[in-house]
A protein has these predicted regions:
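Membrane-interface transmembrane helices that cradle and orient dolichyl/undecaprenyl
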Residues: 210, 240-252
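Regular secondary-structure segments
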Residues: 7, 11, 68-71, 245-249
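Active-site lumenal/periplasmic loops and adjacent helix-entry segments of GT-C-fold
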Residues: 29-33, 40-236
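Hydrophobic cores of alpha-helical transmembrane segments in multi-pass inner/ER membrane proteins
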Residues: 2-14, 123-127, 235-243
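Hydrophobic H-region at the start of alpha-helical membrane spans
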Residues: 2-4, 35-40
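Cytoplasmic membrane-interface regions of multi-pass membrane proteins
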Residues: 16-24, 133-141, 247-252
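Membrane-embedded, hydrophobic transmembrane alpha-helices
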Residues: 1-31
Length: 252
């Protein structure tokens, strides 16, 4: 972080000295606000991760083991942590990126495992915030008087919450609404609710054996502590969306 700050300061100095447009000088305040927003969301998710920081349950032990195996290895794929004669034959892109940052910062897996979780979760808030805020601002160009000037920020926060924090309504329906209806009918509750059930609604109710799938929405994976590629890839996909939007604005 310190090195990045130094590089940014040097590039900014070059911009001022040679009049090169490296940074949008009129947007420095916005950049600082978004950095503070990222830091705040990062701290929030770090606090939540602190309630269960252990690599315990579901696939977290495997995630942690993959990272340790890659930390020890000089080649890829790394040695399989369960079968030393073989190599990892499961997708490990998310764990690889976490190990890359771990080695880059000279840190240890026991530190960066949870920080990577919260790092991705924070980006999953700030990236949508920045993109949707800009989209709304472009949409309202020339019509930002009065209360409308707050709409871009409101839209940005809504987008950030939708991606990083919000989930589906499975818990509300299956843990609250349906049990309440059953209770009114005089039917006793026979099943308890397990939070991963929220990812299992396609093909499960009503049952469709030919079309069952598990939909792990971002917030579920952030709470669970998953570092699979489909989780870490969230920030890359949203970053690509931002680049595409910037490119579309440039060619119009």
């Amino acid at each position: 972080s310190v090195a990045c700050a130094v590089v940014c300061a040097v590039v900014f100095h070059i911009q001022l000295k040679k009049d090169i447009e490296c940074y949008p000088t009129g947007k420095i305040r916005l950049i600082i606000r978004e950095e503070l927003l990222f830091f705040g969301i990062f701290l929030m998710w770090t606090y939540l991760a602190g309630f269960r920081p252990q690599a315990y349950g579901t696939e977290k032990f495997m995630d942690y083991g993959f990272m340790e195996a890659m930390m020890r290895s000089t080649t890829l794929p790394a040695r399989d942590l369960w079968y030393s004669e073989g190599t990892i034959n499961y997708y490990y892109g998310g764990q690889y990126f976490a190990v890359f940052l771990t080695k880059l910062t000279g840190s240890r897996v026991e530190v960066t495992y949870n920080l990577m979780r919260t790092f991705v979760a924070a980006f999953a808030f700030v990236f949508p915030f920045s993109i949707v805020r800009q989209m709304m601002k472009d949409r309202l160009y020339g019509r930002m008087e009065g209360r409308k000037k707050y709409l871009p920020s409101v839209a940005g926060v809504t987008a950030g919450v939708a991606v990083s924090i919000a989930g589906n309504v499975h818990y509300i329906v299956y843990r609250c609404v349906i049990p309440m209806i059953q209770k009114l009918k005089g039917v006793e509750e026979t099943e308890s609710y397990w939070f991963p059930d929220a990812t299992r609604y396609i093909g499960y109710n009503p049952v469709n054996e030919s079309d069952k799938t598990i939909h792990e929405f971002p917030c579920y994976s952030f709470v669970l502590g998953d570092l699979h590629a489909h989780v870490v890839n969230v920030m890359f996909v949203i970053f690509l969306v931002g680049l595409l939007y910037a490119w579309m604005k440039m060619i119009r």
